[in-house]
């Protein structure tokens, strides 16, 4: 399995992971052999890359639970994005507490591992997907520690919000990844601190 950036996707490549829309509806299933039109659709959907299977690689098995987890991650990511966009505009979040409750109910009671891999659509998606992943792991760790539900909800909400300041960082800095200057790093720190002021 390889991660291939959108501009490098070629017809005939096969998807290793399913692609879902914001509502968790399946757009492309695993093992889909990509056509030119599929690639246009993936590009229009805003993906920065996808996981593909190597030419001779068999489709790896995936459990129903792993499939649901992939779907939920995408659904949660878009819900979180809607909430954080509202907050960044000075509005109340639409359903951040509902999202925290969903994550806590679903993952704050698990007694087994889950497999994390993420398909990031854009540099800002990093914030949303990463925050959702941290929230899920926090709910699982909190459950293992025997924390009360009210405490789990607080921890999950904190996980959703802790990287919020990255949304204010100028796009040209975010696109640089690790190739940032000391001045740009200071700028990022200021935006992250500003988010909590």
Give short role names for the model-derived ranges.
Residues 55-189, 193-197:
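Acidic/His-rich, divalent-metal-binding segments that scaffold phosphate/diphosphate chemistry
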Residues 1-100:
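Terminal helices and disordered tails flanking the catalytic cores of nucleotide-processing hydrolases
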